Amino acid sequence: MEAEKRLFLKALKEKFEEDPKEKFTKFYTYGGWQQSARKQEFVSENEKIVAEKRGGIPMYNPDIGVPLGQRKLMPYKISNTDTYVEGDDLHFMNNAAIQQLWDDIRRTVIVGMDTAHMVLEKRLGVEVTPETINEYMHTINHSLPGGAAVVQEHMVEVHPSLAWDCYAKIFTGDDELADELDDRFVIDINKLFPEEQAEASKAAIGKKTYQVSRVPSLVGRVCDGGTISRWSAMQIGMSFITAYKLCAGEAAIADFSYAAKHADVIQMGNALLGRRARGPNELGGVRFGILSDVVQTTRVSDDPVEQSLEVVATGAALYDQIWLGSYMSGGVGFTQYATASYTDDILDDFSYYGYEYVEKKYGRCGTKATMDVVEDIASEVTLYALEQYDEYPALLEDHFGGSQRAAVAAAAAGISVCMATGNSNAGVNGWYLSQILHKEYHSRLGFYGYDLQDQCGASNSLAIRNDEASPLELRGPNYPNYAMNVGHQGEYAGIAQSAHSARGDAFATNALIKVAFADPSLVFDFSKPRKEIARGALREFEAAGERDPILPAKI
């Protein structure tokens, strides 16, 4: 790639205000932590908090510990945008968009409606029509936001301003039925997807009908992901009783409960082992293929690299920053690990280089998945990436950790292999090979054990035992060899997506989840995750689940 076309140069020049090729620089001349407007704000707010709310107990003090700002406290350009932000604003605690990104996934549950409709018609002799479905949808949208009274009288209810983000919608592969339902309640596959994707999704769904419940964000925060399906199920049962004028005590109601809680429920995340201390619909159980289908870039962009990189960014924010950044590192967070893959157009540059190489030599999805192909593409892309780190010291400082560089180079290698083969297993082997090549080049990658899972990855990828060899789409943060190390999981998700992007698939794993997250009523826009994260960093993103309506008024 010609030097002037390198995508990361603009960001490097803006960040460091130096020639990116300059090999000599300065230290301790930038003003320490005071060069950061955000840290100045932290200090100012801290003084008020200590005096007014903490009774003098000290809190934030940037002069404690290692001196901050020895070098440039660099801003970050959110990749594929023109937005520059401070690093602090990408910590998930400081970014409302990243919080809502997770809220919108955790608070979602999909429930099949056909079992309940069958019980109504065959067991109770009640006719189910588009009109009765509309009546039911009116009822569930009343009851779901806060257990609003529909069966019992004299019930306490939730303030609508606390649960404005809560609603239920319906979708089906049956165009005739969809046309007869109230538009306000329908996720319209034909309108939301390009024609070929719409037809593929409807074919996968068939004539079945599904409800998507969006439980209030506040419920997921106060309770947990395991609560979501139960909250949804209770209101589904009450709404069926009301809409179809049933007796709450009759035996058939148990069938509704079983269907809504178990038989017809699709969670976003599987339950984890007891020692992980998490239930269903928690991040550790969200598989890579599911996350690929949650992200919606395939509906709005024809660029397979962009589609893949949006999944990488989403996975980095969720798996690295929230899941591992809290579960493993307890608040210190892995923000810089994650941001390496979605800032400064660096992974974009490496990935587009690989894509151009693939298009010229093989064609998109133009060759079989063989180890010769994996070795060729992964080696080419990895060496290109390492050459950039050698040529541009500013790039090396931007990715100041070895495992940051390893993750970004390997992600580009894996994505590029998928672009040629349309095979996610080949892609993840491109990742593994990149890690090994990188280690040969630099002798080590990052912290001790960073590449442990990559050293055994190639042999496991074709193993028979399912705890080693699940398809990449069905692996996740709790997959045995993947459960320990940051700087991997978001990239794995992007590699899984890239195989399907190369093939032009309508979805990666589950058409139901792809359709459910095409819903324009969601608070977070899943078609442009990086843009949304940038809005969060700029404090332009309005999140749900806030408690202002029940807090004292501020004058």
From Swiss-Prot:
Keywords per UniProt: Cytoplasm, Metal-binding, Methanogenesis, Methylation, Nickel, Transferase
Superkingdom, natural source: Archaea
Database matches in InterPro entries: Me_CoM_Rdtase_asu, Me_CoM_Rdtase_asu/bsu_C, Me_CoM_Rdtase_asu_C, Me_CoM_Rdtase_asu_N, Me_CoM_Rdtase_asu_N_sub1, Me_CoM_Rdtase_asu_N_sub2, Me_CoM_Rdtase_Fd-like_fold
Catalytic reaction(s) noted: coenzyme B + methyl-coenzyme M = methane + coenzyme M-coenzyme B heterodisulfide
Annotated residues for binding of coenzyme F430: Q152
UniProt pathway: One-carbon metabolism; methyl-coenzyme M reduction; methane from methyl-coenzyme M: step 1/1
Pfam families found in the cross-reference section: MCR_alpha, MCR_alpha_N
Annotated residues for binding of coenzyme B: R230, K261, H262, R275
Requisite cofactors: coenzyme F430
Co-factor remark: Binds 2 coenzyme F430 non-covalently per MCR complex. Coenzyme F430 is a yellow nickel porphinoid. Methyl-coenzyme-M reductase is activated when the enzyme-bound coenzyme F430 is reduced to the Ni(I) oxidation state.
Cytoplasm found in the keyword field: yes
EC number: 2.8.4.1
GO BP terms in the entry: methanogenesis
A single Gene Ontology CC term: cytoplasm
Chief subcellular location: cytoplasm
Places the protein is found: Cytoplasm
Annotated function: Component of the methyl-coenzyme M reductase (MCR) I that catalyzes the reductive cleavage of methyl-coenzyme M (CoM-S-CH3 or 2-(methylthio)ethanesulfonate) using coenzyme B (CoB or 7-mercaptoheptanoylthreonine phosphate) as reductant which results in the production of methane and the mixed heterodisulfide of CoB and CoM (CoM-S-S-CoB). This is the final step in methanogenesis.
Subunit structure: MCR is a hexamer of two alpha, two beta, and two gamma chains, forming a dimer of heterotrimers.
Protein name (Swiss-Prot/TrEMBL): Methyl-coenzyme M reductase subunit alpha
The organism of origin for this protein: Methanococcus voltae
Gene: mcrA
